[in-house]
C-alpha cells in the first residue's frame, strides 16, 4: 500500500538567507537547483499544477533566498537560489555558492537533489559542482534537461544519451531525464522519482492505514 502525494496542494512556508535560518532539520526535503535561466520556477509550477507557486523572474539571478514549500506532512521541497548568472556581483555569487554548498553538505533531512539545466547548454561547471557535492554527501541526484521542446526528437535523444554516459563516470546515484514545462514532458517521471524519495516520511501514514483496515470475514 502507498500514500498518494498531492503535489497540487504544495504551498509556500518560508524563505531563509542560509541554512541557519531554515526550520528544524527533520522530515524529508528534496532540493531543486539550477542555473538562473534553467527554468526551475517553471518546472516547480508544472510539477504542482500551479501557475505561480514559484515566482518566475525576468531578471535571472534575482532570487537570493532558500524558499521552502510544504508538500505533505513531513515532506518539503526546497527551491535553492539560482546560480551562475553573469551580471551578479562576484561577492554575491560567492555568498550564494557558500550557502548552497553548506546546505547540501550539512542538511540531514535532505534526501534528494534535482538539478535542472537547459538541454541546449548542459553540464556547466557549477552544475557539476552541485552534483559532486550531493554525491559526496551520498544524496541521490535527478538531472532534468529542461526546455526539451526546444530541440527536435533526434537531437533531444542524442543529448540525453550523451549526458547519461557522462554521469556514469561520476559515481553515485545520478539519473538523467528530459523535461519540458511547456509540453509536460517528463513530469510524470519526476513525480514518480519524488514519490520514492518522500516515501520514508510517509511510512507512518501507511502503517496507520494498515492498522485501520477492517479484518476480513472470510473463513
Swiss-Prot record:
Transmembrane segments: none
Residues noted as binding Mg(2+) in the record, renumbered to the chain: 41, 63
Family named by the database record: Belongs to the TRAFAC class TrmE-Era-EngA-EngB-Septin-like GTPase superfamily. EngB GTPase family.
Domain of life (superkingdom): Bacteria
Function: Necessary for normal cell division and for the maintenance of normal septation.
Domain EngB-type G, chain residue ranges per copy: 26-200
GO biological process, one term: division septum assembly
Record-level Gene Ontology MF annotations: GTP binding; metal ion binding
InterPro entries referenced in this protein's UniProt entry, alphabetically: G_ENGB_dom, GTP-bd, GTP-bd_ribosome_bio_YsxC, P-loop_NTPase
Species this chain originates from: Vibrio parahaemolyticus serotype O3:K6 (strain RIMD 2210633)
A UniProt-annotated Pfam family: MMR_HSR1
Presence of keyword tRNA processing: no
GO cellular component: cytosol
Name of the protein described by the UniProt record: Probable GTP-binding protein EngB
Residues bound to GTP: 34-41, 61-65, 79-82, 146-149, 179-181
Required cofactor names: Mg(2+)
Record carries keyword GTP-binding: yes
PANTHER family hit by this protein: ENGB-TYPE G DOMAIN-CONTAINING PROTEIN, MSS1/TRME-RELATED GTP-BINDING PROTEIN
Keywords: Cell cycle, Cell division, GTP-binding, Magnesium, Metal-binding, Nucleotide-binding, Septation
Amino acid at each position: 500500500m502507498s500514500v498518494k502525494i498531492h503535489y497540487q496542494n504544495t504551498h509556500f512556508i518560508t524563505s531563509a538567507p542560509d541554512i541557519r535560518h531554515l526550520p528544524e532539520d527533520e522530515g524529508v526535503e528534496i532540493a531543486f537547483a539550477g542555473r538562473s535561466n534553467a527554468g526551475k520556477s517553471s518546472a516547480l509550477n508544472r510539477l504542482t499544477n500551479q501557475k505561480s507557486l514559484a515566482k518566475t523572474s525576468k531578471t535571472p539571478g534575482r532570487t537570493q533566498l532558500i524558499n521552502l514549500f510544504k508538500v505533505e506532512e513531513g515532506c518539503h521541497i526546497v527551491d535553492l537560489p539560482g546560480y551562475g548568472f553573469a551580471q551578479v556581483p562576484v561577492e554575491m555569487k560567492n555568498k550564494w555558492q557558500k550557502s548552497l554548498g553548506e546546505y547540501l553538505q550539512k542538511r540531514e533531512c535532505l534526501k534528494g537533489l534535482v538539478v535542472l539545466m537547459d538541454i541546449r547548454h548542459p553540464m556547466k561547471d557549477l552544475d557539476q559542482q552541485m552534483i559532486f557535492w550531493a554525491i559526496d554527501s551520498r544524496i541521490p541526484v535527478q538531472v532534468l534537461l529542461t526546455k526539451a521542446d526546444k530541440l527536435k526528437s533526434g537531437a533531444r535523444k542524442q543529448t540525453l544519451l550523451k549526458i547519461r554516459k557522462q554521469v556514469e563516470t561520476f559515481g553515485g546515484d545520478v539519473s538523467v531525464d528530459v523535461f519540458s514545462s511547456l509540453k509536460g514532458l517528463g513530469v510524470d517521471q519526476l513525480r514518480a522519482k519524488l514519490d520514492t524519495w518522500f516515501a520514508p516520511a510517509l511510512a507512518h501514514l501507511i502503517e496507520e492505514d494498515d492498522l485501520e483496515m477492517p479484518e476480513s470475514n472470510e473463513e
